[in-house]
Amino acid sequence: LRADRVGDEFGVQYIIKGGGNEYQRIKEIAATKASYILSLNFPQPMDVDDPNDARYITLTDMKHWEMAPTNASALEKANIPFCLTSAELRDPKMFMANLRKAIEYGLTENKALEALTKTPASLLNAYD
């Protein structure tokens, strides 16, 4: 959000690479009128088999693990333009599985296709 304020000061509209938690501040993000690049890198499930380890896991961490796959659908519902990237994935082969997971969590198939094709092309001024 700071980058957008700097851009506004100089009359520049940035394309912002998201951190995966945009769903937490969706109203402020919508107000930026910026386009976003979203990674489909979701948090791994936490190992809570050992009670001693489980006590170090915060509610915030567990909530983010649950909500992260809804990030793209939250931007879609707020009419915020975004494209999807495989950046930050530990294994690029997980891209399709994570895309399917995002669709299960509310992202429409049409918007997913648009976020992979039309939106990136539009941001690069390569879409007719």
Predicted regions and their residues:
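Histidine/acidic residue-rich metal-binding segments in metalloenzymes
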Residues: 1-15, 19-36, 66-79, 97
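His/Asp/Glu-enriched, well-ordered alpha-helical/loop segment
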Residues: 35-128
